Amino acid sequence: MPTSKKLKDALAKVDRSKSYTLNDGLELVRSSAYAKFTETVDVAVRLGVDPRHADQMVRGAVVLPNGLGKEVRVLVFAKGEKEKEARDAGADFVGADDLVAKIQEGWFEFDTAIATPDMMGVVGKIGKLLGPRGLMPNPKVGTVTFDVGRAVNESKSGKVEFRVEKAGIIHAPVGKVSFETDKLKENILALIDALVKSKPSAAKGTYIKKISVSSTMGPGVNLDVSDVSSQVI
């Protein structure tokens, strides 16, 4: 199969025993991408935390300086003036009970959801539908707010939410393989900076343990943690 040959060729380029500098690693990921579509570049960061303990949970959001290279469909639960503010900011869908009804019927044609605090009683009705899909508005990541205009702008500009998984790993998209290496680099450094600022006080020892980067279909490339960390402002 041609696809498997392309994957083998991509794997052959990567030395799994080596940790690459951020620049070299990104160049390798971009040159190893082989899919017919424009692949997303993803980062996986292993943190020195045990998320089974509430005081070691890492969660937050960061607006990537160069965006994600894709159109983000934003839904806002709001009424009155806040509804107008959301529409003026470019929200794709704005409403209240009408949107709740659509979602209850199985409609999920949006990428992120924002709600004003007074709407959370209504939104709570569909929490079990939104939560598993990572779409539930949350004040910790700035998606439950009265400043809906700013929240919409941030989401449209490439805001990425992150949350540590059971194994202590954070996964996040940082752009497309079509991005220039410097643009991807700036996005990754912004993510790492946000993770460092989100370090729980209960976390002991080495915090950033491992960083790897890959394209959607390509192999993972291990990055030199000290090289990446030294570039975080």
Curated annotation (Swiss-Prot):
SUPFAM superfamilies tied to this protein: Ribosomal protein L1 (SSF56808)
Pfam families named among the record's database cross-references: Ribosomal_L1
Membrane-spanning ranges: none
GO terms assigned for molecular function: rRNA binding; structural constituent of ribosome; tRNA binding
Similarity comment: family membership: Belongs to the universal ribosomal protein uL1 family.
Family annotation (HAMAP family): Ribosomal_uL1_B (MF_01318_B)
Record's protein name: Large ribosomal subunit protein uL1
Organism expressing this protein natively: Geotalea daltonii (strain DSM 22248 / JCM 15807 / FRC-32)
Gene name linked to the record: rplA
